[in-house]
Swiss-Prot record:
Transmembrane domains' residue ranges: 8-28, 33-53, 63-83, 88-108
Entry's localization field: Mitochondrion membrane
Predominant subcellular localization, coarse grouping: mitochondrion
Keywords assigned by UniProt, alphabetized: Heme biosynthesis, Membrane, Mitochondrion, Transmembrane, Transmembrane helix
Gene3D superfamilies per record: Transmembrane protein 14-like
GO biological process, one term: regulation of heme biosynthetic process
Gene name of this polypeptide: Tmem14c
Membrane protein topology class: Multi-pass membrane protein
Superkingdom of this protein's organism: Eukaryota
PANTHER family (UniProt xref): TRANSMEMBRANE PROTEIN 14, 15, TRANSMEMBRANE PROTEIN 14C-RELATED
Family of the protein in this entry: Belongs to the TMEM14 family.
Protein name: Transmembrane protein 14C
Length: 115
């Protein structure tokens, strides 16, 4: 019997791309509007997402930092999108964050049901 090697593309690969997207969004917000809070939040959350992706690359069961970061951003940016109705940047980051939360929750369910 062949052992299941996991998903075709591990979650941390997407996690590094997500971290880069968040950090780049903060940099673009600063460059276009001069928004220092956007720069600070983008670099902070992008750094946390990068740390979470790195932890996932070392131990696929260590999903907590990544899940907390993407879940927090999904909530914050989801509310901004709901209130403003503007897709950029709030809708984009909220959508990307939700796409990261779903496999993170699935990973937790997988971990908790392991014997």
């Amino acid at each position: 019997m062949q052992k299941d090697s996991g998903p075709l593309v591990p979650l941390h690969y997407y996690g590094f791309g997500y971290a880069a997207l968040v950090a780049t969004g903060g940099i673009i917000g600063y460059a276009k509007a001069g928004s220092v809070p956007s720069l600070a939040a983008g670099l902070f959350f992008g750094g946390l997402a990068g740390l979470g992706a790195y932890q996932l690359s070392q131990d696929p069961r260590n999903v907590w930092v990544f899940l907390a970061t993407s879940g927090t951003l999904a909530g914050i940016m989801g509310m901004r999108f709901y209130n403003s109705g503007k897709f950029m940047p709030a809708g984009l980051i909220a959508g990307a964050s939700l796409l990261m939360v779903a496999p993170g929750v699935a990973k937790i369910q997988e971990i908790t049901t392991m014997p």
